[in-house]
Amino acid sequence: FVTHDTTEMAVLMHADTVLRHYQVLLKKLRRELIHSDTIIKIAPDVYARIKEYATLEQKVFYYNPDDYNNEPYRRLLSIILAKIKATNRHIQSKGTDLDAAHDAYANPQELLEDLRIIRKSVNTHDKAHGEGLLLDTIRLVKTCGFHLAALDIRQESSYHSEVIADIFASASNLPDYHALTEIERQEWLTRLLAKSGTPLIYTDNLTDKTREQLALMNSVATLRKLVGQDTFGSYVISMTNNA
């Protein structure tokens, strides 16, 4: 059966793979987009975004504050690269690295917005570069986000039935699940799923199997917040024939 440990490991490996690949692409873009604002006009949005990241900018360019000073695309790409690295550290630490969390992107949409600001400006004076690797990178981020690929989870139905029965048995305000008819089970489950909050469960009495299933569901919720809402695809309960 699926465990929360293997699920976390798979998601973190996916995130690490795609975020490291973004770093490779950003370094290539930094070598390509070498336009100088002493020669061409750069859109004000690029400078505005650099200013928004002033605190991180100081950390990125602490060794040479004037590096890429007349090459705003390269300067902003350096900041984006630092944010991607921080995002990966934040995810790999499962949210415990507070320094990384401060500099990390909250979601892939924030990264897309930064890249689109650059592309919009580049397209005003150099469409070849605007439609090249930069556009490819944007498309990749739109497709893969921080999760690379949606992870489906599959559990067998009898496993779920045992877990639900155990939860009912551990909750003083719920009936004996095994004694309920099929219709009664459906009614109880529908009623519980329709309202917020959870039954009063005495967790000390739960079996290891139930604890593992609850840990899995908690991991799914945590990872969706950490990596992105598209981290998981379908949750499949196989061989389902009753409640």
Residues of each region from the PLM?
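Extended active-site and interfacial segments that coordinate phosphate-rich ligands
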Residues: 2-29
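Extended, charge-enriched "interface" segments that sit outside catalytic cores
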Residues: 31-226, 233
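Active-site beta-loop-alpha junctions enriched in small/polar residues
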Residues: 153, 237-242
